[in-house]
Amino acid sequence: MRSPPELALSIQLGDGSPACPVSRPRLRRWVLAALQNDARLTIRFVGSREGRRLNRDFRGRDYATNVLTFGYEDDGTQGPANARGRSRSGAAPARPVVADIVVCLPVVDREARAQRKPLDHHLAHLVIHGVLHAQGFEHDDEVEANAMETLETALLRRFRIADPYLPAPSASADRRGARTRAPAR
């Protein structure tokens, strides 16, 4: 049996970021649930201004998004989050995962309210989503998106968190059963 992955986790608060609404041990549990290999990760909580700047500078989208994942190669150079050699089969990379995960708390809070979800549930989903991206998971096409969403849902279930892709209970009847798209990365 394989031993649990080793995790070096750094938590940062960016300028204009509200305090993180959950404890460090709780964040660590979410990360470890999604982690398949040893990792050195930083989770940086940012405000809207920094979130917008990063999304614009690195993705060409001029708005703050909920979560961004920046993967790094062993030599410290930035590469795509999936540059660790994950195969299409989803096999985990052999070397440690090194990444920064940026969470824009004002966006996460706004989305949680709009979706009528507890903030900590939505945050757990996005942290897990970012960790999966750091390991090479993508949602660029329907097959990849379904695989990633299925894994996210299973991981969240361990924490008694409902499927994030199902509509809120008060959604109109014509939306029941419809899945929403994966969050931005």
Segments predicted by a language model, with ranges:
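Residues within the DNA-recognition helix of helix-turn-helix
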Residues: 126
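An acidic/histidine-cluster motif and surrounding catalytic segment
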Residues: 1-123, 132-185
